[in-house]
């Protein structure tokens, strides 16, 4: 017979239960007493510190993982940002160089018109800038009876741009005029190539400060001249020296002026087509 069966009908079982209850009661009292004296309180703080430690360690691990992910994202962003600005700079440089090339080509074609506009706006090179025309100046000085005694030597110069197969020369070397007088000079141009060439000329007067008194009445500058192979033409220059040249103190000591022309090639056409067009004769059918 087992011990539990023997104790079932006896009082010993109730005794043991009471003993078990009384054994738990002092523990509770003891714990409460120690709690009042701080022992259980310290145990509670210990357990809390354990929980805080494990909680902080778990949060530390999460923070470390988030910091690692953030550093990886930052490195990727830096790598992308270093590649992206370089590509943007390359595209900007390409656009800039393309614009420069097109700008240079445009300036090449617009050089002569821009130079003409500049001369007309500033009076550079003897271009008439004042509102009074040359004819009005001549008439005004003729009526006032302006007399000048100073003689000015005007020399002529001719040049052609590189690659232009023209012979371009002044007919006369120089002309002597007085302020208030007009003079006529000629330039000769000849096409030495085997193809038609169209050219346009620019000019300048030196010294430049005397250019405002050098007025051209008739000139071939800034006008296209087309010459066939072997063709030669004479181009006149009719100019006038303002009488105020003599009274201007800035012109003291200036007795020589140089008028220079430079021809530039505008276009070159096909010689074969031109010759065929000029020599084309209608064929008559014979019966």
From Swiss-Prot:
Pfam families: CtaG_Cox11
Source organism superkingdom: Eukaryota
Transmembrane segments: 93-115
Keywords, sorted A to Z: Copper, Membrane, Mitochondrion, Mitochondrion inner membrane, Transit peptide, Transmembrane, Transmembrane helix
Transit peptide: 1-80
Compartments where located: Mitochondrion inner membrane
Entry GO CC: mitochondrial inner membrane; mitochondrion
Membrane topology: Single-pass membrane protein
Gene Ontology molecular-function annotations: copper ion binding
Ranges in the topological domain labelled Mitochondrial matrix: 81-92
Mitochondrial intermembrane side, ranges: 116-287
Protein role: Exerts its effect at some terminal stage of cytochrome c oxidase synthesis, probably by being involved in the insertion of the copper B into subunit I.
Family note: Belongs to the COX11/CtaG (TC 3.D.4.8) family.
Protein name as it appears in the record: Cytochrome c oxidase assembly protein COX11, mitochondrial
Species the sequence originates in: Arabidopsis thaliana
């Amino acid at each position: 017979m087992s011990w539990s069966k023997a104790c079932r009908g006896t009082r010993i079982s109730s005794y043991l239960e009471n003993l078990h209850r009384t054994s738990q009661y002092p523990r509770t009292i003891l714990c409460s007493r120690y709690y009042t004296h701080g022992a259980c309180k310290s145990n509670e703080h210990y357990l809390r510190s354990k929980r805080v430690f494990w909680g902080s360690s778990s949060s530390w691990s999460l923070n470390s993982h988030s910091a690692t992910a953030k550093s990886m994202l930052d490195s990727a962003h830096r790598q992308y940002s270093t590649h992206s600005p370089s590509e943007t700079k390359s595209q900007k440089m390409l656009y800039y160089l393309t614009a420069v090339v097109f700008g240079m080509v445009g300036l090449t074609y617009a050089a002569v018109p821009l130079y003409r506009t500049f001369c007309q706006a500033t009076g550079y090179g003897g271009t008439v800038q004042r509102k009074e025309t040359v004819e009005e100046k001549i008439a005004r000085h003729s009526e006032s009876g302006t007399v000048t005694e100073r003689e000015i030597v005007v020399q002529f110069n001719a040049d052609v741009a590189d690659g232009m197969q023209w012979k371009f020369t002044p007919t006369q070397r120089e002309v002597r005029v007085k302020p208030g007088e007009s003079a006529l000079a000629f330039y000769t141009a000849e096409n030495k190539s085997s193809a038609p060439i169209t050219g346009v000329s620019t000019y300048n007067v030196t010294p430049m400060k005397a250019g405002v008194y050098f007025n051209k009445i008739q000139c071939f500058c800034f006008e296209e001249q087309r010459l066939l192979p072997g063709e030669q033409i004479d181009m006149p220059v009719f100019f006038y020296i303002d009488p105020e040249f003599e009274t201007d103190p800035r012109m003291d000591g200036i007795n020589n002026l140089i008028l220079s022309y430079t021809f530039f090639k505008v276009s070159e056409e096909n010689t074969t087509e031109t010759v065929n067009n000029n020599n084309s004769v209608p064929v008559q059918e014979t019966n």
